[in-house]
């Protein structure tokens, strides 16, 4: 494997790790914030029903409350701390990958040293695969892309430049 190929591979795994980290954070954000919004909306609707008894007779209101309850039930499993813990592990691995990337980029040695870097990369890739969670909440992909390419550009610039990534195509 050449130095350029190794750098590209490190950046590729760095992207996957960063994406997995942001996806876990996105799932936790969506589940936590949406659950709170449902709770606040439920309290607001209950207060309206108390203040305006005519609303108690409207079946649309009942279907709305049922829909919000189903959404709350769907989001409940995603409020677990395992998503935050996984994101924190992936964040540490991403930092190690970033350090490895810059170490390889600065190194002008020959082939034997690249094998050591390749082994470090394999170890970090295995750690990343172990730390990631495959089950994520609906909408976390979109939110992850916004975080990765829009909100946190500085943190991801090293692999974005190497892989020539863009927000749209």
Predicted feature descriptions by range:
Residues 46-65, 72-76:
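Hydrophobic alpha-helical transmembrane segments
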Residues 1-42, 77-168:
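Conserved non-transmembrane functional hotspots
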Residues 41-50, 65-69:
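Hydrophobic, membrane-inserted alpha-helices
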Residues 66-76, 93:
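Alpha-helical transmembrane segments and their membrane-interface exit regions
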């Amino acid at each position: 494997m050449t130095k350029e190929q190794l750098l590209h591979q490190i950046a590729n795994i760095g992207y996957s790790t960063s994406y997995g980290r942001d996806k876990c954070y996105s799932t936790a954000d969506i589940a936590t914030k949406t659950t709170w919004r449902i709770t606040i909306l439920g309290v607001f609707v209950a207060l309206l029903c108390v203040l305006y008894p005519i609303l108690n007779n409207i079946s649309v209101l009942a279907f709305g409350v049922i829909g919000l309850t189903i959404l709350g039930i769907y989001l409940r499993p995603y409020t677990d701390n395992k998503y935050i813990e996984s994101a924190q592990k992936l964040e540490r691995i991403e930092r190690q990958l970033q350090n490895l990337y810059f170490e390889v980029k600065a190194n002008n040695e020959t082939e034997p040293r690249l094998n050591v870097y390749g082994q470090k990369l394999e170890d970090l890739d295995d750690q990343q695969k172990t730390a990631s969670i495959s089950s994520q909440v609906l909408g976390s992909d979109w939110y992850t892309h916004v975080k990765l390419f829009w909100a946190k550009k500085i943190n991801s610039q090293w692999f974005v430049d190497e892989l020539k990534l863009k927000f749209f195509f």
